[in-house]
Structure formats: structure tokens, C-alpha cells
């Protein structure tokens, strides 16, 4: 049944491509449905390692994607509007200088932290996770770096583009988090208005290479790497891709529990005294077959709050939000924020990056505003 559902989503993605606006460079509905179709087909071939997905779980995923897609199409086809703050007044050079300064400061702090942890990214990562090591401004420096990558590509300033691409990559590596590496790759792909099949294959190999390198450096494997390093890397990739689905399925089947009011965690300072809100966003571990996981997809906190209705309500809300943004006429600011919006949608299989990551959305939106206020060059 899982295989059939995945096949239906892939077929739906092909059909829906005909219904979405042809002028949209980033066909977000096609990406979402094709990705989930491939993911579910992949789960079928790896089901011996995980729990089988129930009909309720598959229905929830199908319903969410259907209502998201239909709402998006209705909004995006209604017309193209302009996102603008009028005539820009900030010269590009000041954006480059400001972002460059913030990036260099952030990298210096990151290197100091790495030095204090004996140049071990693994030890540094453990310190960041347990709170004994504070961050080094990645939440601001990385979006600014992506912002300048986008700007430099638009202005055809190759030296600036390569410089900020390198800075972004260094920041993503120093973060010790695969999340920031994925964000880096989303922007590398999103900057290009057209990606050939050959480039897509190269990006895929590059993604796998970064994933493997990250696992080796951090020593994070789902099976014993001793003498079987390639097998251990594939096992780790298997867990990252499919464990959230398995855990969500167990939660739907009432074989797992989550802390109450999980979606309110970012607002614990506001409602912490009136509601029972978790003190941490780290979820409980659960056995999913061969392995354990504490990742439950983005669907779990939605399902906790709204039950099966979450597929309809949140599907419509996100479809409306994405439809609005992807109905704007293409410009620098819109393209930058559209690219960011691809990230939380792709990461649904892993964890929630909307309400639980509202600060991230706010920072990237501010960067989009910064690009909107940029003074256009004479030839534009």
C-alpha cells in the first residue's frame, strides 16, 4: 500500500505540473509531490528495517499534499502581483560589506570554539546540543551570506558570488549541523533559474558526499562503521530519510507519546506559566524496528494539536501562504524568500520548520526586505 501511495503521488506530481503557472521557475507543488512520492516508494524498499505504515498515516500524508496543492494552484493561478518597497536606496556595496563583516566575525568565533574543543567538530557538536557551548551568530550570518550570494549572482559579480559561497560553506560546516548544510545546498540549487539533469545528478552526488563526510567527521553512524564504512553511511542515510515516518506512524497508532503542547514550545516564555509547555524541543526516543529515533516528522506536532483535521487545515494554510508568495512577480527579494520556503517544505519528512522555527522565517524575511530596498544598478 505504501508503494501504491508513492506511485500515486508521483503520478499526481506529473498531472499537477500542467495546472501550475508555467512562468513559475520553482514549481513547488511538483517538487513536494514528487519528493514525497519517491520517499514513500523508497520506504517500501526499506520496510524490513522499519514498521509498516498504516492506512491512517498514508491517508494523512495524501490529504495534506492534496489540500496544499489545490490551495496553492487556486491562489497562484489567480494572478501575478508585485512585491516592492518602491525605489531602493541602499547601494549593493554596503550590503556586501555589512554581510562580509558579520560573516568574518562569526567564522572567527566558530574557529575559536573549534580550537577550544581541540579541533574536534564532534566534541563541539555535543557541546552545542547539550547547551554547554553557545552559538556564534549563525542565525544571522548565514542568511546574510545567502542574501549576498543571490545578489552577486543577480549583478553578475562572480568574485563576490564565489567569496560568499565559500563563506556560506564554511559557516555551514562550522555549525556541525546537517540542517545548515541542506540550507546551503537549497540556495546553491535555488540560485539557478534552470537546473539541467546533469547538474541535478552532480548536486545529488555532492549532497551524498557531504552527508558521508559529515557522518565520518562527527562519528555519527546508525551501524558499526568498523570495516564497513560504506554500509554504515547508507544505514545512516536510511535512518535520516525514513525514521521520522516510522515514528510518526507509531504516534498515529498510539504506540508513542509526545510532550503536550509541542507547537507552543517557541512561546514558552509567553505562555509557560499558564500552559503545560515542554522545557525542551528534544523529543523522546522510540524504537522503530532495527533502530531508535527521536525524529517524528513535521506531521506529529500538527497531528497532536488537530488530529486528522491537521492535514486539511494546515494543508490549506500552507497552500495559501506558498500560493501568495509564488504569485508575486519574480524579482530579487521574492526569489530569495521563495528559495528559503523550499527548505521547510522539503524538511517535512524530518521535523517541523514553520511554527517551531518562526525566528528563522523572520530573519530570512528581513533579508528579503533588505534586497527589496537595494538601489538598482543603472543597467537594470
Swiss-Prot record:
Location relative to the cell: Cell inner membrane
Membrane-spanning residues: 1-21, 27-47, 55-75, 94-114, 132-152, 169-189, 201-221, 229-249, 282-302, 306-326, 332-352, 353-373
Membrane topology designation: Multi-pass membrane protein
GO molecular function: transferase activity
Pathway where it operates: Bacterial outer membrane biogenesis; LPS O-antigen biosynthesis
Main location: membrane
Cysteine pairings via disulfide bonds: none
GO biological process: lipopolysaccharide biosynthetic process
Keywords: Cell inner membrane, Cell membrane, Lipopolysaccharide biosynthesis, Membrane, Transferase, Transmembrane, Transmembrane helix
NCBIfam families from the UniProt entry: glyco_rpt_poly
Function: Polymerase involved in the biosynthesis of the lipopolysaccharide (LPS). Catalyzes the polymerization of the O-antigen repeat units on the periplasmic face of the inner membrane, leading to the formation of the lipid-linked O-antigen molecule.
Name listed for the protein in its UniProt record: O-antigen polymerase
The species this protein was found in: Shigella dysenteriae
Gene: wzy
Amino acid at each position: 500500500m505504501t508503494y501504491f501511495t508513492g506511485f500515486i503521488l508521483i503520478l499526481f506530481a506529473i498531472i499537477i505540473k500542467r495546472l501550475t503557472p508555467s512562468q513559475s521557475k520553482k514549481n513547488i507543488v511538483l517538487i513536494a509531490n514528487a519528493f514525497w512520492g519517491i520517499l514513500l516508494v523508497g520506504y517500501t524498499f526499506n520496510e524490513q528495517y522499519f514498521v509498516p505504515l498504516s492506512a491512517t498515516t498514508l491517508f494523512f500524508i495524501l490529504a495534506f499534499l492534496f489540500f496544499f496543492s489545490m490551495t496553492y494552484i487556486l491562489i497562484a493561478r489567480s494572478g501575478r502581483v508585485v512585491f516592492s518597497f518602491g525605489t531602493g536606496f541602499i547601494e549593493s556595496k554596503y550590503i556586501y560589506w555589512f554581510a562580509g563583516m558579520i560573516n568574518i566575525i562569526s567564522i572567527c568565533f566558530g574557529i575559536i570554539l573549534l580550537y577550544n574543543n581541540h579541533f574536534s567538530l564532534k566534541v563541539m557538536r555535543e557541546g552545542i546540543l547539550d547547551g554547554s557551548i553557545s552559538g556564534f551568530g549563525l542565525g544571522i550570518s548565514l542568511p546574510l551570506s545567502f542574501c549576498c550570494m543571490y545578489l552577486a549572482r543577480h549583478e553578475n559579480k562572480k568574485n563576490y558570488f564565489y567569496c560568499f559561497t565559500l563563506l556560506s560553506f564554511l559557516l555551514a560546516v562550522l555549525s556541525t549541523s546537517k540542517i545548515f548544510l541542506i540550507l546551503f545546498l537549497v540556495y546553491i540549487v535555488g540560485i539557478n533559474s534552470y537546473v539541467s539533469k546533469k547538474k541535478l545528478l552532480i548536486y545529488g552526488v555532492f549532497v551524498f558526499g557531504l552527508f558521508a563526510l559529515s557522518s565520518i567527521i562527527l562519528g555519527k553512524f546508525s551501524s558499526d562503521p568498523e570495516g564497513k564504512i560504506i554500509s554504515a553511511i547508507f544505514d545512516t542515510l536510511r535512518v535520516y530519510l525514513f525514521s521520522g515516518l516510522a515514528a510518526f506512524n507509531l504516534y498515529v497508532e498510539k504506540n508513542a507519546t509526545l510532550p503536550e503542547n509541542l507547537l507552543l514550545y517557541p512561546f514558552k516564555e509567553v505562555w509557560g506559566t499558564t500552559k503545560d509547555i515542554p522545557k525542551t524541543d528534544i523529543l523522546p526516543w522510540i524504537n522503530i524496528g532495527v533502530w531508535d529515533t527521536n525524529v517524528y516528522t513535521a506531521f506529529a506536532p500538527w497531528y497532536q494539536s488537530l488530529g486528522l483535521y491537521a492535514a486539511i487545515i494546515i494543508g490549506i494554510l500552507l497552500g495559501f501562504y506558498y500560493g501568495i508568495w509564488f504569485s508575486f512577480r519574480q524579482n530579487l527579494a521574492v526569489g530569495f524568500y521563495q528559495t528559503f520556503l523550499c527548505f521547510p517544505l522539503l524538511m517535512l519528512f524530518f521535523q517541523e520548520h514553520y511554527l517551531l522555527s518562526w525566528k528563522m522565517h523572520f530573519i530570512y524575511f528581513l533579508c528579503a526586505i533588505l534586497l527589496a530596498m537595494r538601489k538598482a544598478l543603472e543597467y537594470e
